[in-house]
Design a protein with these regions (language model features):
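C-terminal substrate-binding/active-site "lid" region of AdoMet-derived donor-dependent transferases
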Residues: 130-180
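Conserved SAM-binding motif I beta-strand of class I
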Residues: 79-84
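Conserved class I S-adenosyl-L-methionine
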Residues: 53-63
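S-adenosyl-L-methionine
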Residues: 1-52
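Conserved SAM-binding loop of SAM-dependent methyltransferases across substrates and taxa
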Residues: 66-76
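A short SAM/SAH-binding and catalytic strip from SAM-dependent methyltransferases
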Residues: 119-133
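Conserved SAM-binding strand-loop segment of SAM-dependent methyltransferases
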Residues: 100-111
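Conserved SAM-binding loop
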Residues: 93
Length: 180
């Protein structure tokens, strides 16, 4: 085995270990697993956003930034802003956006501290406990008419304007559309 092959193998092993640790730490620190939105579901979420091309689009808990990258690819005029609390996942999102040459802002921050007052559209895939906290935050910060699309989990005190089921595997993923 050549020295280059050994170095490459070492890097691959380190990346696999880092990714595994990221999943464990994400679960232990944030009390939620890192679960990326399937691309089929992401495409439906972007469709439900009814983007015109000039909006400020946020993804709170953006993970690898796939929703923002997809939205930006389909609507280049939008301003895409994401927040991700876990540093290694944030780095993954930054790298993905860089590799795909997708100009977007990705903040390493908690969804509850992100300023969403100028948002036109917000994407969410967060746990039920966070949905309750975000509902209060949105009531205080969002301007009228903001569209919020949530993957899997509804807001506890708000009725969606639309519910959509997306076939996934042997079942369905539910999407909830809200207007503030």
């Amino acid at each position: 085995m050549t020295i280059i092959a050994i170095i490459v193998l070492g890097i691959v092993i380190l990346l696999v270990i880092a990714l595994a640790l990221t999943f464990v730490v994400h679960l232990l620190v944030l009390k939620v697993p890192y679960v990326p939105t399937p691309m089929k579901v992401a495409r439906e979420m972007v469709r439900l956003a009814e983007l015109k091309g000039t909006e400020r689009v946020f993804d709170l808990g953006a993970g690898d930034a796939r929703l923002l990258i997809l939205a930006k690819r389909e609507h280049p005029g939008i301003t895409a802003i994401g927040s991700e609390a876990m540093p290694t996942i944030w780095i993954l999102g930054k790298l993905r956006a860089w590799f795909l040459r997708s100009p977007l802002e990705l903040h390493m921050s908690n969804a509850l501290t992100e300023d969403v007052s100028r948002a036109d559209v917000i994407f969410l895939y967060v746990m039920p406990g966070m949905m309750e906290k975000l509902e209060s935050k949105f009531d205080a910060e969002l301007k009228r008419g903001v569209r919020v699309i949530s993957h899997t989990f509804p807001f506890p005190g708000r009725k969606p304007v639309k519910e959509v089921r997306v076939a996934w595997g042997r079942g369905w993923k539910k999407l909830f559309v809200y207007e503030w």
